[in-house]
From Swiss-Prot:
O-methyltransferase that catalyzes the 2 O-methylation steps in the ubiquinone biosynthetic pathway. The gene is ubiG. This is Ubiquinone biosynthesis O-methyltransferase. One of its GO terms (biological process) is methylation. Gene3D superfamilies: Vaccinia Virus protein VP39. Keywords: Methyltransferase, S-adenosyl-L-methionine, Transferase, Ubiquinone biosynthesis. GO terms for molecular function: 2-polyprenyl-6-hydroxyphenol methylase activity; 3-demethylubiquinol 3-O-methyltransferase activity; polyprenyldihydroxybenzoate methyltransferase activity. S-adenosyl-L-methionine binds at residues 39, 59, 80, 124. Pathway: Cofactor biosynthesis; ubiquinone biosynthesis. It comes from Shewanella putrefaciens (strain CN-32 / ATCC BAA-453). Its EC number is 2.1.1.222, 2.1.1.64. PANTHER family: METHYLTRANSFERASE (PTHR43464), UBIQUINONE BIOSYNTHESIS O-METHYLTRANSFERASE, MITOCHONDRIAL (PTHR43464:SF19). Coiled coil: none annotated. The keyword Methyltransferase applies.
């Protein structure tokens, strides 16, 4: 099986069309900008600090998380299959003076010559956009050093997540373009843990994220019934 087969061309095209608005704080990616400080803090705190560490951001898109990790001292590589988002990411990094290496490649292909290379790997809101999440998770595991951390975020699959992320965020609040998400591709925490358990990763922590449309604020929650992140660590 070729490594580029774990790509959904429609998903790539979807984010290519939105690339030019990636760094518009009030544009289509506003939710990612609002959510990013929580993600960055969770990654930095759970991994024991990422300053000076080699970090790979899988599915980096336009570089929102990648840049924030680089700003606090991580050595960041960003990986994506969308050429337009990567061009936006490279340009923005030049404008802001942040040193990041952006690569157009799949996680599976990149892992071939980066076995045990990174201290931390992040894979945020990406698993629900690929045909084979297990393949991506394995590649992330292969690329992190023993004892290193891999972080995943995705969306639970249930009635509440459908109401909040699709009916609410896409149709009612217009926070995201209609069609951004496919509820059938959402992943239950139990399913994600099972996929992780098929690798040398061990789940160390899980946290939910909730959004208050009245205040426009994201915050952590112990509930993982909609958006959630998990922290995993590779067995030594």
């Amino acid at each position: 099986m070729q490594h580029n087969t774990n790509v959904d061309p429609q998903e790539i095209a979807k984010f290519e069309r939105m690339a030019e608005t990636w760094w518009d704080l009030n544009g289509e990616f506003k939710p990612l900008h609002l959510l990013n400080p929580l993600r960055l803090n969770y990654i930095d705190q759970t991994a024991g600090g990422i300053f000076g560490k080699k970090v790979l951001d899988v599915g980096c898109g336009g570089g929102i998380l990648s840049e924030s990790m680089a700003r606090i001292g991580a050595e960041v590589d960003g990986l994506d299959m969308g050429e337009e988002p990567l061009e936006v990411a490279r340009l923005h990094a030049l404008e802001t003076g942040v040193n990041i290496t952006y690569v157009k490649n799949t996680a599976e292909a990149h892992s071939q010559d980066h076995q045990g290379y990174y201290d931390v790997v992040t894979c945020m809101e990406m698993l629900e956009h690929v045909p084979n999440p297990q393949s991506v998770i394995k590649a992330c595991c292969d690329m992190v050093k023993p004892g290193g951390f891999v972080f995943f975020s995705t969306i639970n699959r249930n009635l509440r997540s459908y109401v909040e992320t699709i009916l609410g965020a896409e149709y009612l609040l217009k926070m995201l373009p209609v069609g951004t998400h496919d509820h059938n591709k959402f992943i239950k925490p139990s399913e994600l843990i099972e996929l992780v358990d098929n690798t040398d990763l061990i789940c160390k922590d899980a946290v939910g994220i909730t959004y208050n449309p009245l205040t426009g604020i994201f915050k952590y929650t112990p509930r993982v019934d909609v958006n959630y992140m998990i922290a995993t660590q590779k067995v030594d």
